[in-house]
Design a protein with these regions (language model features):
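Phosphate-handling DNA/RNA-contact segment within nucleic-acid enzymes
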Residues: 1-80, 94
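Replication-associated primase and helicase/ATPase modules
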Residues: 1-4, 44-46, 72-85, 92-157
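Short glycine-centered, acidic/aromatic-flanked micro-motifs in structured strand/loop junctions
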Residues: 61, 85-86
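Short acidic, S/G/P-rich loop/turn micro-motifs used as interaction or catalytic elements
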Residues: 66, 87-90
């Protein structure tokens, strides 16, 4: 990983069924993809994983938790922040933090089997995925909580 043309860490992904799937060595507060954001974009899509970020020109926090340094870095982009969590239980922690921060949250109702942004792009294409993300974004705490409850129910069944 790089930031301001400096190497700040790396990640390794195992292709078999090992746990954990990833081993990362990164500086605390790093957000993947901030260097790739364009000044004329009105929003930034915040996701958990690198492949998700690459799929939609977003930024990745590299897990389901956002620390204060990452919050400052994302806010420094000075645009609408749209958080798209993985559609799993850990992703719901990201939703809770986004609500605390007053950020928009998008939890599209994608077809069964799609658990993250990259899966959606593979299944539906980039444009359709971006459209569903932007159409599903929400700022109302109540609507976000209702959508989160419905998603958790779907995850558990």
């Amino acid at each position: 990983f790089t930031h301001d043309n400096q190497i700040v860490g790396h990640t390794t992904r195992f292709l078999d069924d090992r746990t954990p799937k990833y081993i990362q060595d990164i500086q605390p507060g790093y957000v993947f993809g901030t260097d790739l954001q364009r000044n004329n974009w009105q929003s930034v899509i915040v996701v958990e994983g690198v492949f998700d970020a690459l799929s939609v020109n977003g930024v990745a926090v590299l897990h389901a938790d956002i620390n204060d340094a990452q919050v400052r870095l994302i806010r420094s982009l000075e645009r609408e922040i749209v958080v798209v969590p993985d559609q799993d239980v850990p992703g719901m922690r990201l939703v809770e933090r986004a609500v605390e921060l007053g950020w928009s949250v998008s939890m599209p109702e994608w077809p069964a089997g799609i658990k993250d942004v990259n899966d959606a792009v593979i299944c539906m294409g980039r444009l359709a995925t971006l459209l569903t993300i932007m159409q599903s974004r929400e700022t109302s705490r109540i609507k976000i909580e209702l959508r989160k409850k419905a998603l958790v129910k779907r995850i558990r069944t």
